[in-house]
């Protein structure tokens, strides 16, 4: 972990992260994780810096060893209704609320905290500085990537398994040629243009 983080004086600490703010399709997925100090997990890092194979192995280890963990989400329809930032905050609240044990303190990746019933702190680059946030980023990314692989089987012509819904040249070309699916975010510029909204 680079740029050493000084932990707050608190008993049970949860880390929270999100994946999927930028894609044009699908949910934004969040995770909250409370690690078990008695069962350390080696190699936790920002999910984006890990190979898919390593992420999947760590996902299984986190699920097995964490004191508790929970996923939250906001679907495309909710993102369109609220906006991506507000939908992400709601999804983070859902992840924290879903934890089997209530944390005393929550550390959130980024520079904003959702309203929570316990103390919380935003940590810039938290996914590479705080083990709990790294674990949350891995759970959220593996979950969302698997959802994109499932969507790819449903709509193979869009290439979702390759670009994960992000606005790559391939995705934009397929979107223009084929139109939007029911899973696309209608409030996002490229989708709006295709739909003539």
From Swiss-Prot:
Keyword Aminoacyl-tRNA synthetase: no
RNase H type-2 domain mapped to chain residues: 11-197
Co-factor requirement: Mn(2+); Mg(2+)
Note on cofactor: Manganese or magnesium. Binds 1 divalent metal ion per monomer in the absence of substrate. May bind a second metal ion after substrate binding.
Molecular-function annotations in GO: manganese ion binding; RNA binding; RNA-DNA hybrid ribonuclease activity
Localization (cell): Cytoplasm
Protein name stated in the entry: Ribonuclease HII
Species name: Edwardsiella ictaluri (strain 93-146)
Gene name of this polypeptide: rnhB
């Amino acid at each position: 972990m680079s740029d050493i983080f000084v932990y707050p004086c608190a008993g049970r600490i949860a880390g929270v992260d999100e994946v999927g703010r930028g894609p044009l399709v699908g949910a934004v997925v969040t995770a909250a994780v409370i690690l078990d100090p008695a069962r350390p997990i080696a190699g936790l890092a920002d999910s984006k810096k890990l190979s898919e194979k390593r992420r999947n192995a760590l996902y299984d280890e986190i699920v097995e060893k964490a004191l508790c963990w929970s996923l939250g989400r906001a679907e495309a329809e909710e993102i369109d209704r609220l906006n991506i930032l507000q939908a992400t905050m709601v999804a983070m609240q859902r992840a924290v609320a879903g934890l089997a044990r209530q944390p005393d303190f929550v550390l959130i990746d980024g520079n904003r905290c959702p309203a929570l019933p316990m103390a919380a702190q935003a940590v810039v680059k938290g996914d590479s500085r705080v083990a709990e946030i790294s674990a949350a980023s891995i759970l959220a990314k593996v979950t969302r990537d698997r959802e994109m692989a499932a969507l790819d089987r449903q709509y193979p012509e869009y290439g979702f398994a390759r670009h994960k819904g992000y606005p790559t040249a391939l995705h934009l070309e397929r979107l223009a040629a084929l139109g939007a699916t029911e899973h696309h975010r209608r409030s996002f510029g490229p989708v709006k243009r295709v739909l003539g909204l």
